C-alpha cells in the first residue's frame, strides 16, 4: 500500500503547527489517525501527542540544524508560539526569554530549563545543538504543574540524543564561515569637517538665541571650539577652520583620520565540527559525541571557544530492569565584550567625535611607537599633539583596551544524569533519577599599565573562582492500566534539588611586568571578595492521566514545594494543574469527513510558583530573602565596619501564577493544512517589588514585599501547510502570531492612586508593566527653537487643560498611552525541496510596540563636550531653518534634548533569522566510500533587519529601551559538509 508522509514543522505562536502527521491517501479511515506512537517530551516522562491537554510545542533537529549559536536558544526568535527571545551578539551568551508575557516585575521571568529530565542550573553554551534531540516548550499550567515552584514562567525541556537508530552509525558535520556585525551603526557624523561645522553651528545658534550678534556668535563659537575640542585634525588653526559665512575652509588639509569602528569591528572566522557515534541493539542504546567550536566575534578580542564530550548510554538488563547514564563534559572560554562604561566599544565608537585619533601622534602628527615597535594609543590625556586633551572619555581607548586588556571567563562543566527503572507487578514501575552538575568558573580581568584608566594605578589584575554544585534526586512511582476503553496513568514522586556555590576572588594593582597575569607580578593588594550560598527546594507531587476511548482526555497534577529562599512560616506552597481535551474528529458525526482529518479542543488551568528574586536594580539572585544581609569592611586599621546590604522580610511569600489555557488543534485537507489556536491568561498574585522605606534606611537595597497583582491575556495561533507535495518537489509554508495585553491589577493602597514611578515607566493599576511615563514633547518654538512640552493647567473658565511650556521643570509627566509591549509578534518561513536541493528561510517580526531610543537622544546632545552627533543634527532648528521638527541643540541649555516622548520610536521590525541552501550528493558518488548520506550546505543567520531607524535594533531589549552598552547582534555565513556513515 502506497503511503505519503506529510511533515509539518513544529512552530510557534498564534498559528502554531505542532508536529509530524502521517496520512494515507487512499484509505479514508487512516487519515483520521495521528502517527502511531508519536510522543512528546513532558514533565517527568513522555506522552502521546493526541493525549496532550495543554500547550506544548516541540522542535526537532531539523528545526535547529541551521542555527550557528554557542547557545541553542539564542537563534530561536520567531520559532516558537508565544515565546519572545531577546539576544546579544556576544558569542556564547544566554538570551532573555519570555513565555506568554511578563511573569514578574522584580522576580525572574525566565523559564525553567530542564536537561534530560533534570533542572539544569548551568549555561546552555556548554551543549552543542548537534547533541539535541528535541526542545519542548511547556507554556500552560497542566504542562508545568509538576515543576511547582519553578514552573511559573514556563519550562523548556531539552532532550539529548540517544542511540535510537538500529545498528551502528557515524555522523560528521563541519562548517567554516564568517561572523560580522548584523546591524549598521546609527547615521552618525564620520567626517571631521562635518563635525567641526556641526559643533560650530550648535554654539553659534545658542549664542544668537541669547541675543548675540552674528559676529559675536561667530567669535564665541570659534573660541569654544578651541577651548573644548582640544584636537585640530587640520593644518590651519581653529580660528581659520570655518569662514565668517559659516562655510568650511576649503584650503584646510586633513592631517589624519582614524576610523574607530573599522578598527574595533572586523569580520572574523567561525569554525565548528561535530562527530557522533550511535549504536542500537536489543539491549543497548548508545550515543557518543565530540564537538569543537571556535566562534570569533566581529568585535576584536571577543569570542567563544568550546570543546565538548558527551556519552549517553542506556542498557536493558532484562524486561524488568533498565538503567542508563548521561555524561557530558564541556570546557569553554569566553572572551567578553566591554561592560557598561565609557570604555564600552559600542557606546564609545558611536559617541566619540570623528576627529579624535585612535593612535598617539607627535607634534608633527606622526604616529608614536613604543620601544617594542608597537603603535601607542591615544587616551586623550594630554599626551597628544601640542598637549591636546579630549573633553570626552579621557583615559579611555577601547581599541587599545581590547589589544592589551583581558576579560576572560573559563568554564569547566561536568554534568551527570543517572537513572534506574524497575517494572513490577505488571502495571507498576519505579524510577530513580539522579542529576549532578559541577561548574568551575574562572574569571580573569587584566587592565594594562600602558594606557587608560588602569594605567593610572600601574595596571590591575583581578581573578576569581566560582565552584558551583547542583544535585537533584527524583523518586518516581508510576501505575499504568488499560481497562477496556478506559486508560489510566498515575504518577507519584518526590524531588530534592540542592545547590551550593562558593565564590572567591582577589584584585591587585601596580604590575611589575606588563602582560604577566600572575599575582606575584602585581605589587599592591586591593581587595579579596568572597561569598557563598546554599539553596534547596523539595517537592512531593502526583499526576493522574485518564482517557476514554482515546477521545476524552483528562489530567490532574498536584505538587507541594518547600524552598529555602523563604522563612519557615512561608516556606511551603501548593501548586496544581488541571486539563481536559476532546478529540472531536473521532466522533461518529465527523470521523468520515474528507475535509477535517483531526480536530481537538482543549482547556487547562492551574497555579505555579516563583522563588527566584533579585536584589532591586540588579540581576543578582537573593537566596535568603527573609534574612538581613551584612557586609564587613576593613578600612586599613583592622577595625571592622559592618554595613547592611539588604533588609530581609520573614513574611515574604511565593509569587503565584494562575494560568488558564483554551484552544483547538486541527488538520485539514488530507493533513495538508494544520492550525493550532489558543487563548491564554496568566494572573500573577503576591507580586514581588521593592518597598518604600524611611529616609534613614537609604544606603542599601530596599526590602522586598508582596505588593500586587498582574495579568497577561492573549491569543496565539499558528498555521502550517504543504502547498505542493510530490516525490520530487515539496513546498511548505508556516506562520505564527502572538498577541497579548499586560495589566497591573492591584497595588498597595499607598500607591494605588499615583502608582510607582519606575524609570521611564509607571506601575499603576490599569496600566501595563512597560507603559511609558514621560514628559510630552509639544514641538518647537519657530521663533527661537526652544523645545516645548505640555503641562497641566486651567483655562479662563477654570477647566483643566494642557498648556505649552518651554520650561522642562514645569512640564508634567504623563502616561503616554504607548507601551514597549508589541501588539503582535511571531515568525514565518518556508522550506522548498526539489529532488536533492533544499532551500529554507525563517523570519521573525513584531508590530505595534514603542521603543525609547536613548542612543538617538545621546547623539542629539546639548552638552559642552565633544561627543558625536546623529546627522539629524542638521535638521534641528536654526534661524535659517525655523520650521524644523527638532529643537535647537546648543551647549547653553542641556534640557533641549531632555527625556520626553520625542525619543519614542516604533519598535516594529522584520528580520531574516536564517537562510539555508542544502544540496544532497547523489548516492552513486558515495557508495564506494561507505558513506550512507552526504550534503553540502550554505547557511546564514541574522542576515537582514528592517526597523524604524538605522542603528536601532528592537531585538536587543524587552523593555524597549535602546541598549547603550549592548552588544549588537552577530551575523554568520558558513559553508558546511555533513556526512553519515
Predicted regions: what is each one?
Residues 32, 38, 64, 90, ...:
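Extracellular/periplasmic, surface-exposed regions of secreted and cell-surface proteins
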Residues 185, 189-242, 330-386, 503-505, ...:
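A surface-exposed, glycine/aromatic-enriched loop/edge motif typical of exported proteins
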Residues 247-250, 453, 563, 846-935, ...:
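Extracytoplasmic gating/loop element in the C-terminal half of outer-membrane beta-barrel translocons
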Residues 151, 162, 176, 291-292, ...:
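A short beta-strand motif that forms part of the nucleic acid-binding face
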Residues 705-822, 833, 844-849, 853-855:
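Gram-negative outer-membrane beta-barrel transporters
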Residues 1-310, 315-318, 322-330, 339-345, ...:
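Short, small/polar-rich motifs associated with maturation and membrane association
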Amino acid at each position: 500500500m502506497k503511503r505519503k508522509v506529510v511533515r509539518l514543522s513544529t512552530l510557534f505562536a498564534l498559528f502554531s503547527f505542532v508536529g509530524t502527521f502521517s496520512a494515507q491517501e487512499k484509505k479514508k479511515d487512516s487519515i483520521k489517525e495521528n502517527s502511531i506512537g508519536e510522543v512528546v517530551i513532558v514533565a517527568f516522562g513522555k506522552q502521546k501527542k493526541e493525549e496532550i491537554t495543554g500547550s506544548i510545542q516541540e522542535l526537532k533537529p531539523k528545526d535547529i540544524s541551521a542555527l550557528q549559536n554557542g547557545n541553542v536558544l539564542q537563534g530561536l526568535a520567531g520559532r516558537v508560539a508565544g515565546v519572545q527571545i531577546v539576544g546579544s551578539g556576544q558569542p556564547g551568551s544566554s538570551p532573555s526569554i519570555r513565555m506568554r508575557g511578563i511573569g514578574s516585575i522584580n522576580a525572574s521571568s525566565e523559564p525553567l530549563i530542564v536537561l534530560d529530565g533534570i533542572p539544569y542550573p548551568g549555561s546552555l553554551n556548554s551543549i552543542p545543538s548537534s547533541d539535541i534531540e528535541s526542545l519542548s516548550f511547556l507554556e500552560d499550567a497542566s504542562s508545568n504543574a509538576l515543576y511547582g515552584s519553578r514552573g511559573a514562567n514556563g519550562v523548556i525541556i531539552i532532550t539529548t540524543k540517544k542511540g535510537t537508530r538500529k545498528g551502528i552509525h557515524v555522523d560528521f558535520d563541519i562548517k567554516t564561515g564568517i561572523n560580522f556585525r548584523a546591524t549598521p551603526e546609527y547615521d552618525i557624523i564620520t567626517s571631521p569637517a562635518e563635525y567641526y561645522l556641526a559643533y560650530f553651528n550648535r554654539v553659534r545658534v545658542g549664542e544668537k538665541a541669547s541675543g548675540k550678534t552674528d559676529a559675536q556668535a561667530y567669535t564665541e563659537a570659534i573660541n569654544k571650539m578651541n577651548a573644548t575640542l582640544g584636537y585640530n585634525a587640520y593644518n590651519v588653526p581653529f580660528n581659520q577652520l570655518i569662514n565668517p559665512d559659516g562655510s568650511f575652509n576649503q584650503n584646510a588639509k586633513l592631517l589624519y583620520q582614524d576610523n574607530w569602528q573599522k578598527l574595533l569591528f572586523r569580520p572574523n572566522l567561525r569554525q565548528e565540527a561535530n562527530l557522533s557515534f550511535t549504536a542500537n541493539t536489543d539491549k543497548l542504546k548508545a550515543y557518543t559525541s565530540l564537538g569543537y567550536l571556535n566562534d570569533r566575534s566581529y568585535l576584536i578580542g571577543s569570542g567563544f571557544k568550546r570543546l565538548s564530550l558527551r556519552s549517553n548510554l542506556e542498557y536493558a538488563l532484562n524486561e524488568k530492569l533498565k538503567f542508563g547514564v548521561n555524561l557530558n563534559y564541556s570546557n569553554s572560554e569566553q572572551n567578553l565584550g566591554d561592560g557598561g562604561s565609557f570604555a564600552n566599544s559600542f557606546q564609545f565608537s558611536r559617541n566619540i567625535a570623528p576627529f579624535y585619533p585612535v593612535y598617539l601622534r607627535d607634534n608633527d602628527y606622526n604616529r608614536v611607537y613604543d620601544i617594542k615597535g608597537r603603535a601607542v594609543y591615544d587616551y586623550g590625556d594630554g599626551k597628544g599633539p601640542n598637549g591636546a586633551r579630549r573633553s570626552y572619555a579621557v583615559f579611555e581607548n577601547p581599541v587599545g583596551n581590547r589589544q592589551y586588556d583581558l576579560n576572560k571567563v573559563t568554564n569547566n562543566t561536568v554534568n551527570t544524569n543517572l537513572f534506574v527503572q524497575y517494572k513490577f507487578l505488571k502495571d507498576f514501575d519505579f524510577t530513580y533519577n539522579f542529576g549532578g552538575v559541577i561548574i568551575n568558573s574562572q574569571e580573569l580581568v587584566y587592565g594594562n599599565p600602558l594606557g587608560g584608566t588602569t594605567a593610572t594605578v600601574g595596571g590591575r589584575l583581578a581573578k576569581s573562582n566560582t565552584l558551583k554544585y547542583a544535585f537533584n534526586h527524583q523518586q518516581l512511582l508510576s501505575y499504568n492500566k488499560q481497562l477496556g476503553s478506559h486508560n489510566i496513568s498515575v504518577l507519584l514522586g518526590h524531588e530534592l534539588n540542592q545547590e551550593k556555590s562558593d565564590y572567591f576572588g582577589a584584585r591587585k594593582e601596580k604590575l611589575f611586568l606588563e602582560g604577566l597575569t600572575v599575582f606575584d607580578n602585581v605589587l599592591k593588594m586591593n581587595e579579596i571578595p568572597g561569598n557563598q550560598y546554599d539553596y534547596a527546594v523539595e517537592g512531593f507531587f502526583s499526576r493522574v492521566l485518564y482517557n476514554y476511548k482515546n477521545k476524552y482526555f483528562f489530567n490532574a497534577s498536584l505538587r507541594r514545594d518547600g524552598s529555602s529562599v523563604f522563612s519557615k512560616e512561608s516556606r511551603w506552597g501548593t501548586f496544581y494543574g488541571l486539563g481536559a481535551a476532546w478529540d472531536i474528529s473521532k466522533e461518529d458525526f465527523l470521523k468520515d469527513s474528507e475535509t477535517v482529518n483531526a480536530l481537538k479542543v482543549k482547556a487547562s488551568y492551574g497555579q505555579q510558583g516563583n522563588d527566584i528574586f533579585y536584589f532591586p536594580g540588579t540581576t543578582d539572585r537573593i537566596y535568603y530573602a527573609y534574612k538581613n544581609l551584612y557586609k564587613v569592611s576593613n578600612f586599613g586599621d583592622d577595625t571592622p565596619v559592618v554595613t547592611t546590604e539588604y533588609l530581609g522580610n520573614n513574611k515574604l511569600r511565593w509569587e503565584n501564577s494562575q494560568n488558564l489555557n483554551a484552544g483547538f488543534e486541527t488538520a485539514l485537507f488530507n493533513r495538508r493544512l494544520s492550525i493550532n489556536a489558543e487563548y491564554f491568561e496568566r494572573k500573577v498574585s503576591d507580586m514581588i517589588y521593592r518597598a518604600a522605606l524611611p529616609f534613614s534606611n537609604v544606603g542599601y537595597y530596599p526590602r522586598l514585599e508582596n505588593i500586587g497583582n498582574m495579568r497577561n491575556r492573549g491569543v496565539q495561533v499558528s498555521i502550517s501547510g504543504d502547498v505542493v507535495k510530490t516525490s520530487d518537489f515539496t513546498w511548505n509554508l508556516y506562520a505564527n502570531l502572538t498577541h497579548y495585553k499586560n495589566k497591573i491589577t492591584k497595588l498597595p493602597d499607598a500607591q494605588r492612586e499615583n502608582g510607582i514611578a519606575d524609570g521611564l515607566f509607571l506601575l499603576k493599576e490599569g496600566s501595563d508593566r512597560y507603559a511609558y511615563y514621560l514628559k510630552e514633547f509639544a514641538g518647537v518654538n519657530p521663533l527661537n527653537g526652544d523645545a516645548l512640552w505640555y503641562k497641566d493647567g486651567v483655562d479662563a473658565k477654570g477647566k483643566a487643560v494642557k498648556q505649552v511650556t518651554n520650561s522642562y521643570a514645569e512640564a508634567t509627566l504623563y502616561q503616554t498611552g504607548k507601551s514597549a509591549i508589541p501588539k503582535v509578534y511571531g515568525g514565518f518561513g518556508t522550506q522548498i525541496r526539489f529532488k536533492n536541493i533544499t532551500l529554507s528561510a525563517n523570519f521573525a517580526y513584531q508590530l505595534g510596540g514603542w521603543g525609547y531610543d536613548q542612543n538617538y537622544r545621546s547623539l542629539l546632545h546639548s552638552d559642552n563636550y565633544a561627543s558625536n552627533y546623529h546627522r539629524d543634527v542638521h535638521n534641528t532648528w536654526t534661524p535659517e531653518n525655523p520650521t524644523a521638527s527638532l529643537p535647537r541643540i546648543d551647549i547653553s541649555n542641556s534640557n533641549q534634548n531632555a527625556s520626553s516622548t520625542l525619543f519614542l520610536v516604533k519598535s516594529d521590525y522584520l528580520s531574516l533569522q536564517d537562510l539555508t541552501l542544502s544540496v544532497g550528493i547523489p548516492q552513486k558518488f558515495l557508495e564506494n566510500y561507505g558513506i550512507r548520506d552526504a550534503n553540502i550546505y550554505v547557511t546564514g543567520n541574522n542576515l537582514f533587519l528592517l526597523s524604524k531607524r538605522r542603528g536601532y535594533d528592537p531585538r536587543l531589549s524587552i523593555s524597549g529601551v535602546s541598549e547603550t552598552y549592548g552588544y549588537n547582534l552577530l551575523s554568520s555565513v558558513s559553508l558546511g559538509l555533513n556526512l553519515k556513515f
